[in-house]
A protein has these predicted regions:
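Anionic N-terminal interaction surfaces
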Residues: 21-111
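Detector for Asparagine
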Residues: 22-24, 32-33, 42, 52, ...
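Phosphoinositide-binding peripheral membrane targeting modules
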Residues: 97-167, 178
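Alpha-helical transmembrane anchor segments and their immediate juxtamembrane flanks
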Residues: 1-21
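Terminal and domain-flanking low-complexity segments
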Residues: 3-9, 173-231
């Protein structure tokens, strides 16, 4: 009987894999068939839903300052960079005032556009905000945003949400070397593998991500990119 146990586990695993693959394919089809131009009219509603629930901590962190748009961000910091830096988890010189310490560990980060300023919230390994950086107009006018090739984990994360998600590298100007982040036209953390389970939530996340890109580009032409849902 023991000889059959590995076979049973393999059969169960394959069955689950095919089930999830089929489920994800159906969800992606629903997302791909969405009229995003019509959905974009709901951007303010979707942002409010997020900020009143899962992302309510961003409202607390911003205090009295308004939130025009927001997005998730991840470090562009791979294994090679970690080895080169001697496995450091901090990097100096990443702010607008003085010398502070910016996490290079793969923790979630949040971008909030408020007026002319872009706020970057860095989190610790417990998911709590432990640093708050503000990039003003002068910094943002000298920053860059470019589309990047879809490969590896970046590609996997984007394609899990249909055909309308693109990835970008945002290089934010500082006194020293730029802060380089990976962002998407959707609410995604590159290094937190997550399988979308609700097509409507995916649509909402895509609208919020595109709204962030649009507002950032409208305010700063040097940070303007074509919106995937309109191309």
């Amino acid at each position: 009987i023991y000889t059959f146990i590995p076979v049973i586990f393999i059969v169960l695993y394959l069955g689950y894999w095919f089930y999830m693959k089929n489920k994800n394919s159906k969800q992606a089809q629903v997302v791909n068939n969405t009229d995003f131009k019509a959905e974009f009219a709901n951007a303010e509603q979707y942002k409010k839903l997020c900020l009143n629930s899962d992302l309510s901590f961003l409202k607390e962190a911003m205090g009295e300052e308004k939130i025009d748009a927001f997005n998730y961000a991840s470090n562009e910091y791979g294994v090679a960079s970690a080895l080169k830096d001697g496995m450091k988890d901090k990097l100096k010189g990443m702010a607008t005032l003085g010398t502070v310490r910016f996490n290079t560990v793969q923790t979630p980060k949040y971008l909030v556009l408020s007026g002319d300023n872009l706020h970057l919230f860095d989190t610790d390994t417990d998911g709590e905000i432990d640093n708050h950086f503000v990039f003003n107009q002068a910094r943002l006018e000298n920053s860059r945003l470019i589309a990047i090739p879809m490969e590896g984990q970046v590609q996997a994360q984007a394609q899990a949400r249909g055909n309308n998600v693109k990835a970008y590298k945002l290089s934010l100007q500082t006194d020293e070397k730029p802060v380089e982040l990976i962002i998407y036209s959707c609410l995604i953390f590159t290094n937190i593998p997550e399988i979308p389970t609700d097509p409507q939530e995916t649509i909402q996340d895509i609208i919020i991500g595109n709204d962030f890109l649009k507002q950032l580009g409208d305010k700063y032409p040097n940070l303007k990119v074509s919106l995937p849902i309109f191309s």
